[in-house]
Amino acid sequence: MDFDYTVTTEKSFDEAVKAVEQETKTAGFRVLYIHDVSATLKEKDFEIKPFKIIEICNAKSAHTILQADIKIGLCLPCKINVYVKDEKTYISGMKPIVLSRFFPKANLGNLPTEVDAIIRGIIDRSK
């Protein structure tokens, strides 16, 4: 099983980032922070193509997951990456369903599957 869900988009990099921001809000999640990785690396004289990490969260889901196992906080908040590779723009997110593999003793119920569907929806509607 792949740990990520990745799509290409015909949108520009900036349009894709804006779309993810909007679709995140529409899905009932919140954008916590956007890391401009390419700008951060450029400050240290390292060049990469445009790359942003968009941290997103739903407080209710996060609370439930952290109650099951506080160590799952290592995987929070959820992240959606937007990047350019080979002249194409990609939107990518980690599949929350993999959390059960990383934390097999945590009783997460259907929540990882539910959040997985929401994140896939955000990505699909953003492309």
Protein language model regions, located:
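Terminal, regulation- and interaction-focused segments at domain boundaries
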Residues: M1-V31, D124
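Intrinsically disordered, low-complexity acidic/polar segments
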Residues: A16, H63, S100-F102
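Short Gly/charged-rich anion-binding patches and loops
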Residues: K18-A19, D36, A68, I118
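Short secondary-structure transition/capping segments
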Residues: T24, C75-K88, I123-K127
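Compact, glycine-rich, soluble single-domain proteins
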Residues: L32-N81
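Beta-strand/loop substructures that line and gate deep hydrophobic ligand-binding cavities in soluble
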Residues: K79-P104
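Well-ordered alpha/beta subsegment
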Residues: F102-K127
